[in-house]
Amino acid sequence: MDKLQRDGKEDTPRQRRFLYPLLFQEDLYAIAYDHYFNRSSSFEPMENSSSNDRFSFLTVKRLISRIRQQNGSIVPFVNCDQTKLVGHNRSFYSELVLGGLTAVPEVPLSIRSKHSLERMNEWTSFRSIHSIFPLMEDKIPHSNFILDIRIPHLTHPEILVRTFRRWIQDAPSLHSLRSVLHEHRNLIISSNLDQLILIASKENTRLSLFLWNYYAYECESLLVPLWKRFFYSRSLPYESFIERTPFYRKIEHIVIFYHKYLKKSLWFLKDPSIHYVKHRERSIIALRGTYLLAKKWRYHITKFWQCHFHLWPQPYRIYIDELSNNCFSFLGYLLSVKMKTSVVRIKMPDDSFITDLITKEFDPIAPTTLLIGSLAKEKFCDISGHPISRLAWTGLTDDDILDRFDRIWRNIFHYHSGSSKKDGLYRMKYILRLPCAKTLACKHKSAIRVVRERFGSELFTKSSPKERESIFLSFSKTRSQRERIWHSDIIQINPLINSCRKKHNLQIEPLFDR
């Protein structure tokens, strides 16, 4: 694998034809175990781990010898019988086999992505989810329509094998992958871990996530060449200035130029700007044009997916929203474009007059109703927003109770600090403060008034003074309530909104915290 990485810059086909022998190398399973098992160990309690789930080269040697006895087939070990594997449980052998099978196709793909990332800027804020919103804030107000795309569900395992042929030319590896995929036809359904339909609950998730990410990359890569060709086509891009708006309306986007020999050609002055953002299985395409142009893009995307993957992507998975009339949900926000009217005084040499200037403004709003629903799902309040005490936390110390409520509040506020309206966040803070006081009152068997006198009016005391000062300044009346702040450190999923998505069955993307 080190040799493959040293020669990865060449990316010759020879490097992709000898991947199957890696399945018989002991180091591959050690790397897969260290990469996957140790990563997930911090999220699993110690009581759930088994003493047999420890890596052993002796176990790997037995596994490789059994694979050789099966004529190189690894499928029998995916659903092997526990009685035939004395001393080790079935799940551990399945973990090793699927971990090794996942590590093999990752070799050429990781080499390619590694060298592509080396050519990028060292600025690391691109990992933040909030880095999407400044782009949308600058570009979406100049767009007319939004294509809200859900990546089509995978229907047949042979589609994945055919897409892997472009990067992996090792036939035995492809045959092994095909055997496992046909053995588990429901291996991959969605990128959401909670919606994965798996035959074995735990050991297939890593392979499923890898296959889904590769499948989503293939769906996305089909559109990039088309957008580049459209962008570099014979068009005259322009910037829309306010004082030139009547001029653009008069020419109706088309100008006829007469050349010699009286030949005329049409030059489109429409702005071919296409802005694209993606998160998990959802993609957003912002277009500047008419409704007919948006319908054409939906038709072409559907046809490209149909011809490339030999499946029928449902057209209803591509929604067309008009920004002037509708809002759309993305990454835990309700996004829309609203008209902003400003009074402007125009002064001329002889006279001056006052007129109204209408501009478009990006308007992200925190979905307060959905956030209250997620808190109700987690038993912090009822469906109407009335606070409820957390009786399950009464066995914790006072500091632990305060710390848990404080982290929930800071995560919600930190993520939705880009909201144009902060009134909903005031309500969320009120809802969380009362359950905190009620929980402490139930623990000490006292009244809420006594708890407030003991801990003060500010119950959330576990945050650092710098963070409390930042939150206080953000909510200060002297600051503009419409000021938006986008943070570059939000990279992890907050499970609070995941429960909200399950309950309301809406396409609301998960909330993120630091």
Swiss-Prot record:
GO cellular component: chloroplast
Example of a GO biological process term: RNA splicing
Subcellular location: Plastid, Chloroplast
UniProt xrefs under InterPro entries: Domain_X, Maturase_MatK, Maturase_MatK_N
Domain of life of the native organism: Eukaryota
GO molecular function: RNA binding
Major site of localization recorded for this protein: plastid
Assigned keywords, A-Z: Chloroplast, mRNA processing, Plastid, RNA-binding, tRNA processing
Similarity-based family: Belongs to the intron maturase 2 family. MatK subfamily.
Function: Usually encoded in the trnK tRNA gene intron. Probably assists in splicing its own and other chloroplast group II introns.
Name listed for the protein in its UniProt record: Maturase K
